């Protein structure tokens, strides 16, 4: 281990959660670890279950350092994380829910969340300086250009503030703005010459963003991970967003190159199209303004009242498939089911068709979204019998001959 560096045993570690612990009695490390796993179970759902995260390597080994003072125990809990910022913050908050260790009352308080990548960047800059010093004796006429490029790469751009939020200088005057997650995202876009950018700084969208969205064209530019989805969900609920742009899958806006940023913004889609893709209705503008739509007058009918159409009776298999759909509600994901209608794989909606094409033995596809023509065609090719979704898109009767389409309605 190098001097001044901590080895967390996982090269993918992005953050380290540090929390202090106090217990009103004598406890040992196994008691603490057991309490953490036991009392956080079920708090964050299956995807962020600590045992599952540890097993898959998304968090590292939980380190506990304890000392006993006058019959009480104090110490430190250290949790390395390769999750994104939002998920890491959720795990940290879950640690604070531990209130009992063994027979003793206890209290856990998160002290800090360290950004390991910041430490790596600082080491990289120090090493770059050393390399440049070693090259001084070999300076060529072009070396000044090299020095300038290295300086530009490590220089921090000036991030301004708009009503307390990190922002570029053109936010107030521009007719259109780009909304990102954090300060680092703003800095990265400023380096690329994009100055009409502002950050929400968390999942609670500030009032300043809501007000700006009422008078400007808004593009939400989010990370290509679960954290980005959460930010986008919150934005769409409270702000008037016009376009949606996403970083490549698994990447954060703050780490994108100029070329990747340009490509992502060029591929932005209208919010109505995005909502259609994930199976949600665009907001009704009349309802947003508080106006109730006028009820349509229906002509009076004489004679016997018309009978309501009865919903088709569902067979046991269909009911079982619709139950699977209810479990997926709000996840923007899809499941592949085998011959026994048991789940074999779960995928993101944006990679559903490609994953289906490479998967064998799938009998049913259940998705929290719209059933599209492209999906049904892929299902026919793979011999899928059922496709189950929130609603049906514009489908030709011809392509539905070999695949049974099931929706909630």
Swiss-Prot record:
It catalyses: ssDNA + n NTP = ssDNA/pppN(pN)n-1 hybrid + (n-1) diphosphate. Residues 175-261 form the Toprim domain. Binds two Mg(2+) per subunit. SUPFAM superfamilies: DNA primase core (SSF56731). Mg(2+) 2 binds at residues 223, 225. One of its GO terms (molecular function) is DNA-directed RNA polymerase activity. Residues 280-289 have a biased composition (Basic and acidic residues). This is DNA primase DnaG.
